[in-house]
Amino acid sequence: MAMQKLFTYIYEFIEYRKMVLLEEKVPYDKFVQMVFNTGFFRINAETLNHGIVSVFIFGANGKYVHHGGDMRTLLTNTLNEKKQYEELILIVDKPILGKKNILDIIVEQRAANPTVVINIYPYHLFCINIPKVSAIPKHKLITQEEAQEFLGREYLQPQDLMQISASDPPVVWLGGRPGDFVQIERPSETAMHAVVIRFITKSKI
């Protein structure tokens, strides 16, 4: 069931982020075959800024999430390709996020490739279309100029704002980065919506 949802919603995620697929969407059976037989399924897409984003969905029992050397080789070879990489998104079964050898490789690859955003997330972030969940308030990234205008009007500094992690599900779907600002519309008893601004901070992983 998780794989079926991942297959459905990862493409909705790419569309929501306004990315363009660089290959045709594959049938579900091929997706499953790749995840379980090869160990991962890869989607390549292009951003509005013409940067390349590669999404890797790893099988829960594949060699890449259990053997650090295989993960290191995969990421190194990917980033050595002659492409203008903007982001790598690694999607894994939640227990993998507790494996130190895998997380150490993520840290290592970030240090070696400072211009590329490399993030690792659990399956469940992509097993539902987060922006369509009615219980979650509307989130929207705002520009630095809009944020500075708000801060100036309220006589605030960025550190005065409440924070939100870059790994928060709505922020992940928006593509928010540490240092960005997100506007959240919450229901209000005195108005249609109460608008709050949050400062995005680095995630723990």
UniProtKB/Swiss-Prot annotation:
It comes from the Viruses. One of its GO terms (biological process) is tRNA transcription by RNA polymerase III. One of its GO terms (cellular component) is host cell cytoplasm. GO terms for molecular function: DNA binding; DNA-directed RNA polymerase activity. Coiled coil: none annotated. Keywords: DNA-directed RNA polymerase, Host cytoplasm, Transcription, Viral transcription, Virion. It is found in: Host cytoplasm; Virion. It holds the Pfam family RNA_pol_Rpb5_C. Its main location: host cell. InterPro entries: Arch_Rpo5/euc_Rpb5, RNA_pol_subH/Rpb5_C, RPB5-like_sf. Belongs to the archaeal RpoH/eukaryotic RPB5 RNA polymerase subunit family. Component of the DNA-directed RNA polymerase (RNAP) that catalyzes the transcription in the cytoplasm of viral DNA into RNA using the four ribonucleoside triphosphates as substrates. Part of the viral DNA-directed RNA polymerase that consists of 8 polII-like subunits (RPB1, RPB2, RPB3, RPB5, RPB6, RPB7, RPB9, RPB10), a capping enzyme and a termination factor. This is DNA-directed RNA polymerase RPB5 homolog. It comes from African swine fever virus (isolate Tick/Malawi/Lil 20-1/1983) (ASFV).
